[in-house]
Amino acid sequence: MRVLVLGSGVIGTASAYYLARQGFEVTVVDRQPAVAMETSFANAGQISPGYASPWAAPGVPLKAIKWLLERHAPLAIKLTGDVDQYLWMAQMLRNCTASRYAVNKERMVRLSEYSRDCLDELRAETGINYENRSLGTTQLFRTQAQVDAAAKDIAVLEQSGVPYELLDRDGIARVEPALAGVKDILAGALRLPNDQTGDCQLFTTKLADMALKLGVEFRFGQDIQRLDFAGDRINGVWIDGKLETADRYVLALGSYSPQMLKPLGIKAPVYPLKGYSLTVPITNGDMAPTSTILDETYKVAITRFDNRIRVGGMAEIAGFDLSLNPRRRETLEMIVNDLYPRGGDLSQASFWTGLRPATPDGTPIVGATAFRNLFLNTGHGTLGWTMACGSGRLLADLIARKKPQISAEGLDISRYGNSREVAKHGQTAPAHQQ
């Protein structure tokens, strides 16, 4: 059985790998010249199942108003006049209740924990190396109010059986010695010892190499134009003016997924959350982080690779704008100087931006659609790296009609009440328009 995977980020590549392991004949198509060249290229590098949380949370609407007035705010909104932007933000606001937050976080943690287990198994089986570490994640709180607010997340961790440790200032210095000199500006921390780190782009490249050995074909530099459909089946995909056919189709185009699905009558509430990162060469390893640090105040992660520090985070709701905002670089540099002033050489840092495909409830869209041979693996937001292996394996099981190792409840697009609307055949814009 032939499967055509659209998109070669970490999600599409993981989908292809796990499908090939189950014996499918897989082809991956992407407009870029190689895998992981867009959102997967320079993300924060953290694999943090326990910190899998939706942006839509109680109190966020009021915080967002306050953040609009702050220079180093973790969230910024640039209104584009796009109706989809307004609809997505309205849906996000509806998810900012305590009850919906709990449901959404449980779904995210469920998939993230499974994904971490899949990654562990993959690493044990293949020895894949991607500058990975298994030294946990430490979430830093600068105020006592932040420490107190972590109680709701701890309750979900306990419910899900995720190990954690609350740290005082001395405890922070114990697990992250380079923070000993600045511990007085911190109120405490929450540490998840089972979390991991690694270079997502390097991982995806090596996973693609392993997929090639399983017979997966990668076709780069090709324009994915539209899906051809009739009734409840996909007939093929128009790629560079030619109709390509398969038995099953997987859409893993990140933020560009809705453009492909809209002509089919499928409304996928996926919208780009623009994020930024700095990659900083390490000059003093003893003054750099040992693993991943999350700064709760600025929503920024600082991650240790072998000889580099990756600083990533923030979110701009600004459509498909990929311009580099110098104020965001200023914020990232400020945080590094605040916590690790002697760890790396900021003058040699590389600055990057990417569009994370976010859903309004934070949970990705993984699973079947109203079309019998079309499957989705998209909408992972800031957690594509964390959820990649689990999402790919889950999707492969669903396509193979095998019982997944975790519950898929609440993960597919049907949770939005997404009944297919009548759509005109073949009328769509290129899925990769910018």
UniProtKB/Swiss-Prot annotation:
Pfam family, one: DAO
Domain of life: Bacteria
Keyword annotations: FAD, Flavoprotein, Oxidoreductase
One Gene Ontology MF term: D-amino-acid dehydrogenase activity
Cofactor: FAD
Pathway: Amino-acid degradation; D-alanine degradation; NH(3) and pyruvate from D-alanine: step 1/1
One GO process term, biological-process aspect: D-alanine catabolic process
Signal sequence region: none
Catalyzed chemical reaction(s): a D-alpha-amino acid + A + H2O = a 2-oxocarboxylate + AH2 + NH4(+)
GO cellular component, one term: cytoplasm
Protein name according to UniProt: D-amino acid dehydrogenase
Species of provenance: Pseudomonas putida (strain GB-1)
